[in-house]
């Protein structure tokens, strides 16, 4: 949810984001997922109903969900092995990764979609995106330069930088 910031400039938790939608603080959203469970969705019907009155909802996911049924636009998502770039996991560890396989024809990873929407020239370059984020966000400053193979714990880097 890069770009969906709270009043104190932090990224909101999912429940806080849903509350922003309930109060119409947020009226448009691009939700990307990629959860490999077609039998059960990551977003239940009750949570998805909160998005009913949005002006614009883009959902990019591997599988249909209660949320994708409400989308203004539905885009196919690329799986983890079909992307390259930097991930930050739930433990606040940032790691770079390389694409292992090509996505199906017509499927673009989120980064490439954003790259094109921003009017960037040439091929999608996730390293330059990481460098730009590192330069412009104190919380991600540790992502500048080479990243060790085991990644960087962003919490430790923030603590060390204060």
Task: Please tell me what each predicted stretch does.
Residues 1-148:
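Non-catalytic alpha/beta scaffold blocks inside enzyme catalytic domains
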């Amino acid at each position: 949810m890069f770009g969906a910031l709270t009043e104190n400039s932090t990224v909101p938790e999912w429940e806080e984001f849903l509350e922003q939608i309930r109060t119409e603080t947020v009226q448009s959203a691009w939700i990307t997922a990629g959860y490999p469970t077609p039998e059960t969705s990551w977003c239940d019907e009750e949570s998805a109903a909160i998005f009913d009155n949005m002006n614009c909802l883009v959902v990019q996911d591997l599988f249909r969900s209660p949320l994708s049924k409400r989308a203004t636009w539905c885009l196919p998502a690329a799986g983890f092995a079909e992307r390259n770039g930097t991930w930050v996991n739930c433990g606040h560890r940032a790691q770079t990764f390389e694409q292992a396989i090509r996505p199906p024809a017509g499927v673009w990873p989120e980064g490439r979609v954003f790259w094109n929407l921003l009017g960037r020239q040439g091929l999608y370059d996730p390293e330059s995106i990481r460098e730009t984020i590192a330069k412009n966000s104190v919380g991600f400053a540790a992502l500048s330069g080479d990243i060790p193979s085991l990644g960087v714990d962003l919490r430790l880097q923030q603590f060390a930088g204060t």
